[in-house]
């Protein structure tokens, strides 16, 4: 599955509605609401959790994924060391990361692309990507369906 910075993952494009996603991947294994009443879809086979924002008319705005099949710029990311991933990203001009530490986990956040690499024991175990917020402080929805 190809990660498309600022747009989504694979066929998932930020701004899609729940029915658009179901048309592509079928019904999710889990469907629930979080503490903010956002709708969450979880797909076991894809190893993805999708968030549809309540305040944005339930548009797809955030994806958390841990599938070993994911690729960013042609490189797999899950299971690789964060230094390898960051070196590959540097070749594409992505060099600025904010690091947060939590017990054995670290998050490496790049705000320009709204991506997070979560590591444990120096290895990428999870990837998060969110819809971009533009200069007007609004979401830049990419899906035009």
Model-derived features with residue positions:
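Intrinsically disordered, low-complexity regulatory segments enriched in Ser/Thr/Pro
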Residues: 60-68
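A short, surface-exposed helix-loop junction/capping segment
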Residues: 1-5
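Extracytoplasmic Gram-positive cell-surface binding/anchoring modules and repeats
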Residues: 12
């Amino acid at each position: 599955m190809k990660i498309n910075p600022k747009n989504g993952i694979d066929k998932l494009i930020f701004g899609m509605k729940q029915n658009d996603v179901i048309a592509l991947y079928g019904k999710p294994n889990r469907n629930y609401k979080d503490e903010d009443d956002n709708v969450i879809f979880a797909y076991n086979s894809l190893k993805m959790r999708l968030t549809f924002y309540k305040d944005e008319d339930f548009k797809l705005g955030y994806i958390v994924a841990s599938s070993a099949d994911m690729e960013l710029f042609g490189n797999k990311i899950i299971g690789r060391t964060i230094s390898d991933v960051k070196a590959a990203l540097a070749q594409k001009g992505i060099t600025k990361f904010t690091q947060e530490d939590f017990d054995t986990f670290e998050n490496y956040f790049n705000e320009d692309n709204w991506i997070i690499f979560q590591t444990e024991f120096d290895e990428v175990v999870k990837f998060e990507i969110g819809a971009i917020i533009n200069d007007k402080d609004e979401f830049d929805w990419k899906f035009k369906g």
